[in-house]
Amino acid sequence: MTLYLTRLIPHPSSRLAQQELGAGTSHASLHRRVMSLFPDGVPEQARAHFGVLFRVEDTPCGSHLLLQSNQPPDPARLPAQYATLTTRPLDPLLDALEPGRTLHYRCTASPVRKPGATTRAHYKLPAVVPLNGTAADEWWHRQADQAGLKTLTLRSQPVDAARDRQYPADTTRADRAKHSNRIHHHRVRFDGTATVTDPDLLRTAVLSGIGRGKAYGCGLLSIAPAPDPA
């Protein structure tokens, strides 16, 4: 399966693009914008069908969107003057993976643990507990191992949580306050270098993403060649 990586750079004159990619945006709205780049009429789970993973990147020139998919997004489906898209295939990078190769990696993920029912009741914990600091780093090391990577260096930085509200399809606007489900995905950005231990596991992790919250900008694993350590 061919994978594509697209960088979406919002047009400076598009207030809509700046709003949708900016801080405090509705992550559900951003998800809908991303999915609008792909054909309609597919079965449920359209994100999985098109292999979509995405992440907002803060750059000196403003916020950009990185988008991975199994078919190129269609820029004609965006509003006029919304953004510029640049797409390239990831196959050459993925095909060249081999054990021992050193890579740069980046992933904004949602590190959590799910305590058992007894532990939750005893300590009055929620069903999902966000991880921070050393606990988040340890979570990443486990995820990297399962993804065919041996972590060499790691920098972790908390980023704003992905927050939104979800409503049943038949809920009226007047009843939304009573029937909404709160969505909250704690997020940490992990950067560093790693050595490839299992290319097949790594390809699967790139294809499938890491962790939860993938519809809300979590889980995209980006890799790039790095010089081998001396």
Across the structure, where does each feature detected by a protein language model lie?
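RNA-interacting cores
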Residues: 1-230
